[in-house]
């Protein structure tokens, strides 16, 4: 699952993403290796502690982040937040959270981008495109294989931000200006 709609009202869209089952399975697998090495080893308790701590460190490093996106029409802002247990441990609970705040009126388009994920193939992520020309992904990691899930979230986000209405209006304005310029050329 790419992102789940936590709540949706007329003025608020709250999207959330938790670590995937693959990520949790990897965590359990790596921790199991450390525990098995400690259990079956004839080394001292200090080495056994090192095995478990080392594997726990690697397991937490490979755990995906918790990601959240809140689009609020009342405040006119989108807040993209990323939480990481690994960063929290490294900074001794002072960090572990990255936050990006964007004005909703700056978002021009919402697209699904394809990313190459090493060893696994293709992944998909939603990209927010701004009027300044800058692009920013909605999440830090791509989801593997399920393009339809990502497109459904992108469609929901486009509908909430009313970007499809903006496109329709701009196309209508372009067509009317084209027909006016054609009419002016015909008169000459």
Swiss-Prot record:
Statement: the UniProt record of this protein carries the keyword Transmembrane: yes
Membrane-traversing stretches: 20-42
Subcellular location: Endoplasmic reticulum membrane
Membrane topology term: Single-pass membrane protein
Example of a GO biological process term: respiratory burst after phagocytosis
Key words of the record: Chaperone, Endoplasmic reticulum, Immunity, Innate immunity, Membrane, Transmembrane, Transmembrane helix
Matches recorded under InterPro entries: Cybc1
GO cellular component: endoplasmic reticulum; endoplasmic reticulum membrane
Keyword Transmembrane helix part of the UniProt annotation: yes
Lineage top rank: taxon: Eukaryota
Family: Belongs to the CYBC1 family.
Protein function: Functions as a chaperone necessary for a stable expression of the CYBA and CYBB subunits of the cytochrome b-245 heterodimer.
Protein name per the record: Cytochrome b-245 chaperone 1 homolog
């Amino acid at each position: 699952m790419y992102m789940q709609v936590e709540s949706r009202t007329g003025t608020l869209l709250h999207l959330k993403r938790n670590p995937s089952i693959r990520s949790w399975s990897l965590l359990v697998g790596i921790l199991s290796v450390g525990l098995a090495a400690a259990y079956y080893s004839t080394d001292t308790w200090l080495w056994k502690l090192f095995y478990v701590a080392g594997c726990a460190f690697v397991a937490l490093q490979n755990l995906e982040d918790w990601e959240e996106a809140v689009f609020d029409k009342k405040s006119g802002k989108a807040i993209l937040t990323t939480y990481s247990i690994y960063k929290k441990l490294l900074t001794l609970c002072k960090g572990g959270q990255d936050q990006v705040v964007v004005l909703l009126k700056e978002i021009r388009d919402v697209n699904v981008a394809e990313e190459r994920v090493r060893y696994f193939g293709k992944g998909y992520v939603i990209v927010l495109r701004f009027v300044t020309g800058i692009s920013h992904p909605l999440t830090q990691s791509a989801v593997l294989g399920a393009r339809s899930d990502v497109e459904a979230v992108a469609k929901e986000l486009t509908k909430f931000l009313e970007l499809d209405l903006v496109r329709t209006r701009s196309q209508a304005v372009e067509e009317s200006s084209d027909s006016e310029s054609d009419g002016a050329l015909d008169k000459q």
